Structures are given as structure tokens and as C-alpha cells.
């Protein structure tokens, strides 16, 4: 739960911009080129624009935002994008979102409050590794907090690795003229994760408190080879094959978690 600071009487609108960014990775091993292609097709179907729209619509509901407009697109050969414009106050009926022209007042608000997702399936050309990355951004202006959607987003996607950034920008002024650069208490993004999520992941923080920048990386603690194999079972592989695949997968996970290639 996001704990606000003692209630402030503001001069006008709360001008703080809060932005939560996710990189979520799913890692898989598919032995043959045909299996890797089927993995891409599977991911493309699982996370098409319709499914992503539903996830982001749920996010808007969770954080208490009103939907202004929805734009979505599936790409050829793979991938999808969805952008939802949101506000604190309802402007048009939810059923009409994406069907009506938006007023100038709403257009002026677009760059401030939105939820976006882009997907990036890809495969290694030789080694059998296949990955799916979803980039999600939730940016709000005012009292709405994107942190409320943390756990839902992690659970909604196949999250082997999660990289999160949260920042608060701008200021809001109280009736006495004093500027406030944040309106809630936070020491770490981890504060807002559910216990069952924290118990499953190893987590690492890099926070710059004086700049209101918070960064958390997570990867699953337990490694079950069957969870990473596509159209295959570990029991059907030789010991040598299992060790080779496990080494490849663990290396891929470490490199994605740290954001750099490891030396051979």
C-alpha cells in the first residue's frame, strides 16, 4: 500500500509526475529451429494486442485511473504494442474510449498520464535460447500511484526476470507556497511487493533517494529446468544434455539480470 505523507492543502492541481517502468523477461530453451519458431508463435498469440489491452485496462482499474483512449497494434512478423491514455477524472464513457475524438484539454494531458506496453520476442540463431521481453510504462500525473499495479503486472506476465524503475518528477505547491517534490513515503520498490512475490525472487536495489529515483532488479530464486524447456521434458534428456542446457539458461538469466555479457 502506498502511504501518503500527512495531507497537504494544495494550491491548484497536484503536478507531481510518477513513472514506473518495467522490463519483464521470459527465458526459454527450444532445441530446434522449428521449435524456436513455434515458441515465437506461441508467445505472439499469448501476448497479442487484445490480451495486452486487457492487462493494461486492469492496471488502470487497479490504480484508480479513468481510460480516455486506447491504441493497439499487432506487428508482422511478431510483437505488439498498446497505449492507453488515462486521467484521474472521467472525461468520456469507458465504453467509448478509442471511438470518440478527444478534447483539447485531454490532448494536453496525454504526455503526462499513460500506460504502454511493447513486446519483443527473439531467439538465438544457434544455441536454442529464446526470450520474450515486455516493456511496460505506467506514468501518472496527480495523486494516482502506479505502484499499486506492481504485483498484478508481475503475476500477469511470465516473469523470470524483472527490472523496475520508479521516479517522481516535478513538484506540487501547498497553499502557503511551499514546494513538495514527493507526496508519499518510499525507501524501496520492494516495500510495495506482496510477500508471496518477494519469497520467490532474489532482489537487488540501486536507489538515489535525494533524486527520488528507485531501481529494483529481481530474478526467480528456484531453477526448475522443466519450466524453461519448450515442448520437451528434462527426464527425456541425457545428463550431459541437461547440464549443457542448464548452463546456457543460467548464463542467459545472469546476463539479462546484470544487463551485460559475461566473459567466457
Swiss-Prot record:
Q: Which Pfam families match?
A: AdoMet_dc
Q: How is the cofactor bound?
A: Binds 1 pyruvoyl group covalently per subunit.
Q: Which species is listed as the source?
A: Xanthomonas axonopodis pv. citri (strain 306)
* Gene3D superfamilies in the record: S-adenosylmethionine decarboxylase
Q: Where is this site: Cleavage (non-hydrolytic)?
A: 112-113
Q: How is it modified after translation?
A: Is synthesized initially as an inactive proenzyme. Formation of the active enzyme involves a self-maturation process in which the active site pyruvoyl group is generated from an internal serine residue via an autocatalytic post-translational modification. Two non-identical subunits are generated from the proenzyme in this reaction, and the pyruvate is formed at the N-terminus of the alpha chain, which is derived from the carboxyl end of the proenzyme.
Q: What is this protein called?
A: S-adenosylmethionine decarboxylase proenzyme
Write the Enzyme Commission number(s) for this entry. Answer: 4.1.1.50
Record note on quaternary structure: Heterooctamer of four alpha and four beta chains arranged as a tetramer of alpha/beta heterodimers.
Give the main EC class: lyase
* Domain of life the protein comes from: Bacteria
Q: Which reaction does it catalyse?
A: S-adenosyl-L-methionine + H(+) = S-adenosyl 3-(methylsulfanyl)propylamine + CO2
